[in-house]
């Protein structure tokens, strides 16, 4: 018999009754029923009930065992009485009568219990992550993560992609976030960087003649933490292909993700049609470039109904350049109580409130109610109702100003309305491609033109497009949203040096600076670079959605906390003075 186990804690069934077996695992819980000791023994695979009575030679030893001790037991498999069968576990028809027991690893008093559903502070869970990971939900999440990564790999191999590993230590490259810098001992005063993404390397692979590349890639970004984002590192399915169009990229990644969500989505519906929505329309309709399409609400511009109206706030606002009034329909939200709740929501978001109209039954007909309805009159109110397709029992909320200033709050209000009114389908994965991202934006204070999104995407229209108004230039850049989260981001790359130099020139970067920052890639593009493009899918977010977790740290093995600290490993830590001397560094305290 094997030194530690002949079976796992999920293997045994009624067919094994009478066999002598050996199990190893952790003590999930201990119970004393009338002098008979019961232990639920747990390993990675499942739970087996083991027991012994006072006549057993290991009874006294078993009395000493406590929760989360690691033990080995030998015993005989017994059938449970029919009334004691536990259908909730795979071994529920049997129990193991212990003949021998060995303590493999005793445990000190536990800072958190593995058994049960008790909640603990996140700081405690992260400090003792190895205990937290023993809990059933965390085991399930990590198994799911492993299975998702395996499925992604298998599908990419099946599609004839080659898996390559790109460097982890490289040059600093401004890609939208702060780099983690690594000082060089051999080159004092110079620094490497951990890659924010394998962006340049995967493009260089295309120049090197490899047609289809993928990698389960670690990415490192010094970012402020959010519930859906790790502050230091994350993993992505990184993809790049040569001689492809934007639609080719969509056609590759859609079946891959569809299979993953169908396979691991717990029976939720997976949309088969993935609409392509322009960035401009996404901002107008949803107030977000990662819309949640489970919510059917579409915002609309209603400026014409308020121009010159009796509602002076909106009428005066529309006289300013670049302003707009938008409506958020709320089917089923037609009560003053709900409208007041939404006003309170807007105030929490930093607004004075939201204008609203709601429609109610007045016996002989329909009546529009609310302060806006009184100010703009029945004709304008009716025109708004017809445009939005609303009726009795419905409402509409209104925000105005320069769209960039209110779109984010409008999007949050749309999401809140959808959840409050039960309009958002909780049993569905809804996908949408967001396309036609603007390449440039103007700083409202300085008037300076800078990149709004990926500077390496090919402008639609090529070099000719860059000769006109920069703010009208859109790129072959795309994101994939699912249920309000950005899952995929990608682009068809700007592989022509002359177009790249012009694109950067518009944003104020000269050719010399571009060569200095991106010299490796720019030089390579001078030697017959093929048209190429790709994307990257965030594995952490995919698993978070599939596991129905609101916090991304629930699907990462050893995450940092909100302050980018590893409480378990005490990172970041202060270096030894000798280490600093070797690197030619000195720590200057902040005042």
From Swiss-Prot:
EC number: 6.1.1.23
PROSITE patterns: AA_TRNA_LIGASE_II (PS50862)
Reaction catalysed by this enzyme: tRNA(Asx) + L-aspartate + ATP = L-aspartyl-tRNA(Asx) + AMP + diphosphate
Keywords per UniProt: Aminoacyl-tRNA synthetase, ATP-binding, Cytoplasm, Ligase, Nucleotide-binding, Protein biosynthesis
Binding site for L-aspartate: 175, 221, 453, 493
SUPFAM superfamilies: Class II aaRS and biotin synthetases, GAD domain-like, Nucleic acid-binding proteins
GO biological process, one term: aspartyl-tRNA aminoacylation
EC class of the enzyme, as a word: ligase
Pfam families in the cross-refs: GAD, tRNA-synt_2, tRNA_anti-codon
Main location: cytoplasm
Gene3D superfamilies xrefs: Bira Bifunctional Protein, Domain 2 (3.30.930.10), GAD-like domain (3.30.1360.30), Nucleic acid-binding proteins (2.40.50.140)
Entry binding sites for ATP: 221-223, 486, 538-541
Described purpose of this protein according to its UniProt entry: Aspartyl-tRNA synthetase with relaxed tRNA specificity since it is able to aspartylate not only its cognate tRNA(Asp) but also tRNA(Asn). Reaction proceeds in two steps: L-aspartate is first activated by ATP to form Asp-AMP and then transferred to the acceptor end of tRNA(Asp/Asn).
HAMAP family: Asp_tRNA_synth_type1
Protein name: Aspartate--tRNA(Asp/Asn) ligase
């Amino acid at each position: 018999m094997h030194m530690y186990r002949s079976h796992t804690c999920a293997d045994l069934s009624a067919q094994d009754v009478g066999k002598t077996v050996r199990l190893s695992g952790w003590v999930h819980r201990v119970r004393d029923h009338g002098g008979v000791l019961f232990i639920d023994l747990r390993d990675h695979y499942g739970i087996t009930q083991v027991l012994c009575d006072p006549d057993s030679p290991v009874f006294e030893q078993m009395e000493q065992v406590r929760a989360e001790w690691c033990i080995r037991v030998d015993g005989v498999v017994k059938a449970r009485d029919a009334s004691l069968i536990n259908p909730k576990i795979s071994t529920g028809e049997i129990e193991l009568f212990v003949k021998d027991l060995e303590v493999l690893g005793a445990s000190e008093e536990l800072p958190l219990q593995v058994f049960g559903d008790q909640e603990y502070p996140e700081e405690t869970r992260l400090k003792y992550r190895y205990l937290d990971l023993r809990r059933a939900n965390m085991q399930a999440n990590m198994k799911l993560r492993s299975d998702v990564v395996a499925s992604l790999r298998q599908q990419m191999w099946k599609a004839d992609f080659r898996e390559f590993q790109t460097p982890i230590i490289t040059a600093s490259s401004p890609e939208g976030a702060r780099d983690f810098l690594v000082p060089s001992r051999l080159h004092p005063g110079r620094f490497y960087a951990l890659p924010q993404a394998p962006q340049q390397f995967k493009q260089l692979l295309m120049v090197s003649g490899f047609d289809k590349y993928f990698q389960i890639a670690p990415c490192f970004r010094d970012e402020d933490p959010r519930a859906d984002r790790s502050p230091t590192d994350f993993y992505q399915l990184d993809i790049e292909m040569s001689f492809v169009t934007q639609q080719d990229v969509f056609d590759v990644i859609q079946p891959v993700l569809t299979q993953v969500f169908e396979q691991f989505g717990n029976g939720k519906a997976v949309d088969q049609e993935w609409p392509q929505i322009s960035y401009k329309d996404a901002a107008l309709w949803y107030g977000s470039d990662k819309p949640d399409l489970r919510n059917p609400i579409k915002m609309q511009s209603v400026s014409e109904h308020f121009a010159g109206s009796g509602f002076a706030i909106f009428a005066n606002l529309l006289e300013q350049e670049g302003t707009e009034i938008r409506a958020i329909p709320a089917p089923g939200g037609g009560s003053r109580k709900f409208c007041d709740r939404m006003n309170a929501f807007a105030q929490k978001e930093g607004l004075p409130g939201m204008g609203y109209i709601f429609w109610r039954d007045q016996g002989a007909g329909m009546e529009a109610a609310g302060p806006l309805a009184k100010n703009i009159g029945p004709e304008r109110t009716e025109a708004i109702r017809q445009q939005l397709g609303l009726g009795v029992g419905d409402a509409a909320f209104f925000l105005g100003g320069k769209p960039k200033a209110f779109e984010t709050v409008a999007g949050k209000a749309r999401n809140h309305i959808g959840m409050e009114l039960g309009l958002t389908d909780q049993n569905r994965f809804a996908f949408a491609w967001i396309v036609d991202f603007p390449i440039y934006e103007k700083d409202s204070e300085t008037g300076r033109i800078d990149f709004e999104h990926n500077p390496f995407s090919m402008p639609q229209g090529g070099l000719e497009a860059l000769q006109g108004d920069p703010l009208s230039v859109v790129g072959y850049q795309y994101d994939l949203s699912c249920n309000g989260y950005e899952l995929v981001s990608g682009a068809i790359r700007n592989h022509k040096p002359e177009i790249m130099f012009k694109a950067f020139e518009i944003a104020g970067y000269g050719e010399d600076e571009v060569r200095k920052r991106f010299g490796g890639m720019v030089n390579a593009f001078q030697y017959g670079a093929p048209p190429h493009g790709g994307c990257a899918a965030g594995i952490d977010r995919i698993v978070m959605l599939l596991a129905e977790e609101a916090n991304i740290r629930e699907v990462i093995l050893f995450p940092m906390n909100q302050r980018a600290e590893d409480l378990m490993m005490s990172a970041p830590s202060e270096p030894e003075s000798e280490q600093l001397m070797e690197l030619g560094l000195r720590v200057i305290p902040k005042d």
